UniProtKB/Swiss-Prot annotation:
Listed name of the protein: Acyl-CoA desaturase
Motif Histidine box-3: positions: 298-302
Residue(s) carrying Phosphoserine: 203
Encoding gene (name): SCD
Catalytic activities: octadecanoyl-CoA + 2 Fe(II)-[cytochrome b5] + O2 + 2 H(+) = (9Z)-octadecenoyl-CoA + 2 Fe(III)-[cytochrome b5] + 2 H2O
Role of this protein: Stearoyl-CoA desaturase that utilizes O(2) and electrons from reduced cytochrome b5 to introduce the first double bond into saturated fatty acyl-CoA substrates. Catalyzes the insertion of a cis double bond at the delta-9 position into fatty acyl-CoA substrates including palmitoyl-CoA and stearoyl-CoA. Gives rise to a mixture of 16:1 and 18:1 unsaturated fatty acids. Plays an important role in lipid biosynthesis. Plays an important role in regulating the expression of genes that are involved in lipogenesis and in regulating mitochondrial fatty acid oxidation.
Length: 359
């Protein structure tokens, strides 16, 4: 039995998942309808949480000259130093203790989950609900990752979805690989990002005390959890050299987590296939999913941003979904939203690339 089918049988026995079903419609019956007349909220896409993370095809860039790039030299210098330190950390790998490797792997996975299961699937898209202990864990893990606080990350990500591949998209991939990967962090935001970002409903984030607490104490939290703790633990507990602890366990580990996330914005918007919606840039990219613990099924995710698995196949190359399901098994996660097979097939028939089909 295929792994994803076995997983579905197992998970259905111990948890409740909200399935987003496809109501009867002419679209599902014959795949008809012209794409340019497709409404903003498709019949198969309707769900109750929020709609500020759903692509708005009606938004277009304003005509006229583009604003001049304004470089943020502080970010350029810090990113340059970080990656120089990470490169030096690579040369130290042969001298590191085995416990340090295990520590780095542990810190990498926890940090990644703070992004994927935390700020992305929980807070940005509200694809599932989490009880307080899980939310506390994810807010700590997110701080360990140091990729902006939950409020700012979620705001930018909702803008990225709603205004994808336009000037209002913070990391618009139409501006090139480097810009969508890291360049967007090295320059001032395009005025359209600020203008359209201000129109998004962020009341759910402002109302959550844990999110605002993290935002208030983010800088000292990052200093402790992203830099001090991962350096001191191997140095103090098992006698790793301070040099290895700093450059390998901290700088290299942090740089790898950053680039794994950035590849979702760059590579997964340029390389891969589009079985769900060929009219948008995001693609299915297995290599990205491996590094980003399940975030590489990007054509599916941009088509169905409210699916907690961010993929049609749940556990397939998707450790984040496995983690969320484990949390559901012990009662810490609930109300996981999963798009029905009928809705997926209907969307593939109508907008997907013809050379691919649902597995």
């Amino acid at each position: 039995m295929p792994a994803h089918l076995l997983q579905e049988e197992i998970s259905s026995s111990y948890t409740t998942t909200t399935t987003i079903t496809a109501p009867p419609s002419r679209v599902l019956q014959n795949g008809g309808g012209k794409l340019e007349k497709t409404p903003l909220y498709l019949e198969e896409d309707i769900r109750p949480e929020m709609r500020d993370d759903i692509y708005d095809p009606n938004y277009q860039d304003k005509e006229g000259p583009k604003p001049k790039l304004e470089y943020v030299w502080r970010n350029i210098i810090l990113m340059g130093l970080l990656h120089l330190g990470a490169l030096y950390g690579i040369t130290l790998i042969p001298t590191c203790k085995i416990y340090t490797f295990l520590w780095v792997l542990f810190y990498y996975v926890i940090s990644a989950l703070g992004i994927t299961a935390g700020v992305h699937r929980l807070w940005s898209h509200r694809t599932y609900k989490a009880r307080l202990p899980l939310r506390v864990f994810l807010i700590i893990a997110n701080t360990m990752a140091f990729q902006n606080d939950v409020f700012e990350w979620s705001r930018d990500h909702r803008a990225h979805h709603k205004f994808s591949e336009t000037d209002a998209d913070p990391h618009n991939s139409r501006r090139g690989f480097f810009f969508s990967h890291v360049g967007w962090l090295l320059v001032r935001k395009h005025p359209a990002v600020r203008e359209k970002g201000a129109t998004l409903d962020l009341s759910d984030l402002r109302a959550e005390k844990l999110v605002m607490f993290q935002r208030r104490y983010y800088k000292p939290g990052v200093l402790l959890l992203c830099f001090i703790l991962p350096t001191l633990v191997p140095w103090y507990l098992w006698g790793e050299s301070f040099q290895n602890s700093l450059f390998f366990a901290t700088f290299l580990r942090y740089a790898v987590v950053l680039n794994a996330t950035w590849l979702v914005n760059s590579a997964a918007h340029m390389y891969g296939y589009r079985p769900y919606d060929k009219t948008i840039n995001p693609r299915e990219n297995i290599l990205v999913s491996l590094g980003a613990v399940g975030e590489g099924f990007h054509n599916y995710h941009h088509t169905f941003p409210y699916d907690y698995s961010a993929s049609e196949y749940r556990w397939h190359i998707n450790f984040t979904t496995f983690f969320i399901d484990c949390m559901a098994a012990i009662g810490l996660a609930y109300d996981r939203k999963k798009v029905s097979k009928a809705a997926v097939l209907g969307r593939m028939k109508r907008t997907g690339e013809e050379s691919y089909k649902s597995g």
